[in-house]
Regions:
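Short, high-confidence coil segments that cap the C-terminus of an alpha-helix
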Residues: 131-133, 324, 398-400
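C-terminal helical cap/extension that packs against the catalytic core
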Residues: 194-216, 231, 299-302, 308, ...
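N-terminal leader/targeting and accessory segments in enzymes
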Residues: 1-48, 52-67, 76-77, 190-193, ...
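Nucleotide phosphate-binding/pyrophosphate-handling subdomain across enzymes
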Residues: 38, 134-137, 145-158, 162-166, ...
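Beta-strand->loop->alpha-helix junctions that form or flank phosphate-binding loops
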Residues: 71, 194-195, 207-229, 246-250, ...
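Acidic, Mg2+-coordinating active-site environments of NTP-dependent enzymes
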Residues: 110-111, 118, 131-138, 154-239, ...
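ATP-dependent carboxylate-amine ligase catalytic core
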Residues: 17-18, 22, 26-37, 63-152, ...
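Active-site-proximal loop/hinge segments that shape catalytic or ion-binding/gating pockets
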Residues: 408
Length: 422
């Protein structure tokens, strides 16, 4: 059975009317022998940047000699990508075997776990079986009631940039969302917060004081950008030697500060992570589908940003890379996102826009999106498939132009597959 076969079986238990809570996950893990109790963790939450932060940190830990698990979501193309050890996705055979075990255990419970709860259990079983020294876990939604929050106190709990997201579940204010995400903070961990609004900072700091948790907040004034281009970004932070980060985008500098402060937190917990390991780990870091340059002449950049904050960060990064040059955009969005604000952020940068419908039942119709773009005064054309849309976008571009495919991780995964990248 392939990873996609397993994904289809697990997806049968997607959220319906089940209430958020940890009881189902705790019961499931108990039925499986509590594999999470054999593991050490770094727990990462936030609205934006948590996946990139997790990937960079996992790369650094692997470079330091630790057998490192990485649990992230969603996947770009293959379900197996969600469960990695030292950068390698779980093999199909192991995924099939562990999924069978998890589903069998789930069937014995009074209330069946949800899709993400099943994935969490599969991940913890795999990381325990693989003998991981540390597991970097990305929260699925929120923090306090996310299924990953059944873990014991992590060595480090990390909160990246927080924005208004999933407001029906997490709350309608930054303070409410920050309180939910602060739910991953447990006595015995060390906390790292990406420096942001006072509203968020006060909530997180208060939670740390209540639980006697040391807190480090990133400091933009301690970062010096030495150079930036399509080959990556060179910088120093808190007096470090110059470091190279191949990931593009201004926002990745914010994320890498969080990574470096987390490394210091882990050192304080007794982990041996040398400066060389940090340099090599960052230089080797990869996070596909996030401002990823996949082709030159013309440049083709793909990005899975999915909300207005991501769109704003993307626009700023593209201006940094291309100045006032107009780009061609290939865009597919989900109808339940604030797509007008998202697309509005890149309209001033657009020479033309090609629209496509992502492979999702929540997708925005490509013809409606193209009509809306044209109404804003930007040329647009719609195509039914990713392959057709990519061909159309590239046909509009000369060798010196740039194409940016963006708007949904669903579209980005399909696009990388079309390009033979996965």
């Amino acid at each position: 059975m392939t990873g996609e076969d397993v994904a289809a079986r697990v997806h049968a238990y997607a959220w319906t009317d089940r209430k958020p809570g940890l009881e189902r996950t705790r019961a499931l893990l108990a039925a499986l022998g509590n594999p999470e109790k054999a593991l050490k963790f770094v727990h990462i939450t936030g609205s934006n940047g948590k996946g990139s932060t997790a990937a960079m940190l996992a790369s650094v830990l692997a470079a330091a000699g630790y057998r490192t698990g990485l649990f992230t979501s969603p996947h770009l193309y293959r379900f197996n990508e969600r469960f990695q050890v030292n950068g390698a996705p779980i093999p199909d055979a192991a995924l099939d075997r562990l999924a069978e075990r998890v589903l069998a255990a789930a069937d014995t419970l009074p209330e069946h776990p949800t899709e993400f709860e099943l994935m969490t259990a599969i991940g913890f079983l795999w990381f325990a079986e693989a003998g991981c020294d540390l597991v970097v876990v990305e929260v699925g939604l929120g923090g306090r009631l996310d299924s990953t929050n059944v873990i014991p106190a992590p060595e480090a709990a990390v909160i990246t940039n927080i924005g208004l997201e999933h407001t029906a579940i997490l709350g309608s204010t930054l303070a409410a969302i920050a309180a939910e995400k602060s739910g991953i903070l447990k006595p015995g961990c060390r906390a790292v917060l990406y420096g942001q609004s006072r509203e968020v900072g006060e909530i997180v700091a208060r939670a740390c004081v209540e639980k006697n948790i040391p807190l480090t907040v990133t400091d933009d004034s301690q970062l010096t950008l030495l150079s930036s281009g399509l080959d990556g970004q060179r910088f120093t932070y808190r007096g470090s030697a110059p470091l190279l980060l191949p990931l593009l985008g201004d926002y990745q500098l914010r994320n890498v500060m969080t990574v470096l402060d987390t490394v210091d937190a882990l050192r304080a917990q007794g982990r041996n992570i040398s400066a060389d390991a940090v340099a090599h780990g960052l230089a080797a870091a990869r996070w596909p589908g996030r401002l990823e340059l996949v082709h030159r002449r013309p440049d083709l950049i793909i990005d899975g940003g999915h909300n207005p904050q991501c769109a704003q960060a993307l626009a700023a990064s593209l201006r940094g890379l291309y100045g006032e040059k107009k780009l061609i955009f290939l865009i597919g969005v989900l109808a339940d996102k604030d797509w007008q604000s998202m697309v509005g952020e890149v309209l001033p940068l657009a020479k033309a826009i090609v629209t496509v419908r992502p492979e999702s039942d929540r997708a925005k119709d490509e013809n409606e999106l193209a009509a809306w773009v044209r109404a804003q005064g930007v040329p647009a054309e719609a195509h039914a498939s990713i392959g057709e849309a990519l061909d159309a976008a590239l046909a509009l571009a000369g060798p010196e132009d740039a194409v940016c495919a963006w708007g949904s991780l669903y579209s980005v995964g399909e696009l990388r597959h079309c390009l033979g990248l996965c």
